[in-house]
Curated annotation (Swiss-Prot):
It comes from Papio anubis. Residues 62-85 are annotated as: Disordered. The gene is SERPINB10. Keywords: Cytoplasm, Nucleus, Protease inhibitor, Serine protease inhibitor. It is found in: Nucleus; Cytoplasm. InterPro entries: Serpin_CS (IPR023795), Serpin_dom (IPR023796), Serpin_fam (IPR000215), Serpin_sf (IPR036186), Serpin_sf_1 (IPR042178), Serpin_sf_2 (IPR042185). Residues 70-79 have a biased composition (Basic and acidic residues). This is Serpin B10.
Length: 397
């Protein structure tokens, strides 16, 4: 399971860099864990080159801890095998069960599903494996004759699964009579901070988008003993904010320079992020924390992005090999749709009522001001499995 979590985190950073190429200066927010999980559902039914490409993009067949080289990449593409695939899906089952374990302190709900044209029936074995590993049931629908009705039904299902927060996942004209198979995924999260911000401490402050432009934002404030980590190159400071129960945490990477986000994104790798955010790097400080309230909602049509990352065959009618999913010829993945929503406020992530008392440590620690008044990166992490659930870039609240 640790290896799978590493693969998901590596995929998160690769995907973030690819999305950043077409979103310079814009906010980014997505659930890497949700996207990886839903793509693994498709991967379960792939064979041959299609499977090898997906395994490469999703980092499933990368030797953990081994540095990449052209030779190792070529070898890795050729070493895909079915036993490796079975282990991956078994690990997904374990990871999903752990992350979605019922919890009184936060709520995580997924909406991952595969919809296939009914004239391309799924193998019984594939349906059984989907239920075993992912607790999911692929749906056979009538895209040919009722594509828009199916689109509306899918949107309604996603909305119900995400407490009404993810609406209209599939936009108008995104599904038509030529659609053969689509993948939809969304993740809804509601959590309460371990230490909540006091509403009366929230005031209007400037957020510096760059050296010449700023905008007024509602800036939250608290003074607490919190965990800080320092990054020497590129120069940045990080902070960990726990959610109640400490199963999840918000990690913020704040460049020291107002324009330092581009360099931070360029330099970040899974290995570096893992090192920066390790327990050994965390130090307890008396922190004067300034954090903007913000709400992000991003939608992604991931077909072109995933194709450019290397899994083009899955989207090709002539090249896709989904023989592990269906015996019908010419079955291919028409599109992958993803939508994510986050709201950071005084209570936590997404509004939630709650009160709590706490006992402050009397140990003297150094003090520091952490002023998130310019662009930064943030992650929501499941700590027990070390899995990045959400990746975000805030350029303008």
């Amino acid at each position: 399971m640790d290896t799978l979590a590493t693969s998901i985190n590596q995929f998160a950073l690769e995907l973030s860099k690819k999305l950043a190429e077409s979103a310079q200066g814009k906010n980014i927010f997505f659930s890497s864990w949700s996207i990886s999980t839903s793509l693994a559902m498709v991967y379960l039914g792939t064979k041959g080159t299609t499977a090898a490409q997906m395994g490469q993009v999703l980092q499933f067949n990368r030797d953990q801890g081994v540095k990449s080289s052209p030779e190792s990449e070529k070898k890795r593409k050729m070493e895909f095998n079915s036993s490796n695939s079975e282990e991956i899906h078994s690990d997904f089952h374990t990871l999903i069960s752990e992350i979605l374990k019922p919890n009184d302190d936060y709520l995580l709900k997924t909406a991952n599903a595969i919809y296939g044209e009914k004239t391309y029936p799924f193998h019984n074995k594939y349906l059984e494996d989907m239920k075993t590993y992912f607790g999911a049931e692929p749906q056979s629908v009538n895209f040919v004759e009722a594509s828009d009705q199916i689109r509306k039904e899918i949107n309604s299902w996603v909305e119900r699964q995400t407490e009404g927060k993810i609406q209209n996942l599939l936009p108008d004209d995104s599904v038509d009579s030529t659609t053969r198979m689509i993948l939809v995924n969304a993740l809804y999260f509601k959590g309460i901070w371990e230490h909540q911000f006091l509403v009366q401490n929230t005031t209007e402050k400037p957020f510096r988008i760059n050296e010449t432009t700023s905008k007024p934002v509602q800036m939250m404030f608290m003074k607490k003993k919190l965990q800080i980590f320092h990054i020497e190159k590129p120069q940045a400071v990080g902070l960990q904010l726990y959610y109640k129960s400490r199963d999840l945490s918000l990690l913020i990477l704040l460049p020291e320079d107002i324009n330092g986000l581009v360099q931070l994104e360029k330099d970040i790798t899974y290995e570096k992020l893992n090192e920066w955010t390790s327990a050994d790097m965390m130090e307890l400080y008396e922190v004067q924390l300034h954090l903007p309230k913000f709400k992000l909602e991003d939608s992604y049509d991931l077909k072109s992005t995933l194709s450019s990352m290397g899994m083009s065959d899955a989207f090709s009618q002539s090249k896709a090999d989904f023989s592990g999913m269906s015996s019908a010829r010419n079955l291919f993945l028409s599109n992958v749709f993803h939508k994510a929503f986050v709201e950071i406020n005084e209570q936590g992530t997404e509004a939630a009522a709650g009160t709590g008392s706490e006992i402050e440590s009397r140990i003297r620690v150094p003090s520091i001001e952490f002023n998130a008044n310019h662009p930064f990166l943030f992650f929501i992490r499941h700590n027990k499995t070390n899995s990045i659930l959400f990746y975000g870039r805030l350029c303008s609240p």
